[in-house]
Every structure is written in structure tokens, then in C-alpha cells.
């Protein structure tokens, strides 16, 4: 029976969970604030991992920039704790990147809901005009 997920996907999923726990409990840098791990991409040889994060106050570009810098500075510490938490021969080198997809998704959702609301208002106005 074939496996549903490849090893890299399983490792990435476990890394996402472990890094989220590490950021919540171990990283004390105030620049990181409330960081959420939204995804992890691992290379096929498990040597590199790209960690996608979002921040609580990510409306300000300076907050995002300083948060990413703090995470990159702490990547060695996070990697050491990750090595203790996971049983891997080689712990991947971590690179942190901001995940704008969540913010973009919320923006698109707001645009769609505004269009639906405007459309409903136009329909009700057109229905009132037809009745008169």
C-alpha cells in the first residue's frame, strides 16, 4: 500500500507543530511577539526548511521586518531545540519568511462581502423603483 504523504511532507508537518511550540514557550525576544507558524516547506534532502510565519500586528511593515529579523537571529537556538524535540539525523537549516496569504485572503474576503452587500442594496433599490 502506497503512502499517502511523502517523508518530506510528514517532516514538514511535524516541524510546523514543534516550531510553533518552541516560539510560544522558549523564544523570549519581544520583537517576535505573537508569531504563528502557518507552514513549513522542507527540501527533499531535509537539509533546508523554509518556515512561513504571520504576526499578530502584521499591519505595520516595520513590525514584520523586525519580527523576521529576530526569528532569523534566533534560528540557531530554534534549530537546537528542534533537534532535541525531533529525531532526525540532520536538523534542517531554518529560513523564516512572512506569509502574506492570510492577509491577502482576508482582504479578498472583505472585497467580496462588500460587493455582495452593494449588489443586495442595488437590487432592493431596483425592486422599490419597479413597484412605484
Curated annotation (Swiss-Prot):
This is Ribosome-binding factor A. It comes from Edwardsiella ictaluri (strain 93-146). One of its GO terms (molecular function) is ribosomal small subunit binding. SUPFAM superfamilies: Ribosome-binding factor A, RbfA (SSF89919). Pfam families: RBFA. Keywords: Cytoplasm, Ribosome biogenesis. Monomer. Binds 30S ribosomal subunits, but not 50S ribosomal subunits or 70S ribosomes. Gene3D superfamilies: 3.30.300.20. One of its GO terms (biological process) is maturation of SSU-rRNA. It comes from the Bacteria. It is found in: Cytoplasm. Belongs to the RbfA family. The keyword Signal does not apply. Signal peptide: none annotated. InterPro entries: KH_dom-like_a/b (IPR015946), RbfA (IPR000238), RbfA_dom_sf (IPR023799), Ribosome-bd_factorA_CS (IPR020053). One of several proteins that assist in the late maturation steps of the functional core of the 30S ribosomal subunit. Associates with free 30S ribosomal subunits (but not with 30S subunits that are part of 70S ribosomes or polysomes). Required for efficient processing of 16S rRNA. May interact with the 5'-terminal helix region of 16S rRNA. GO terms for cellular component: cytosol.
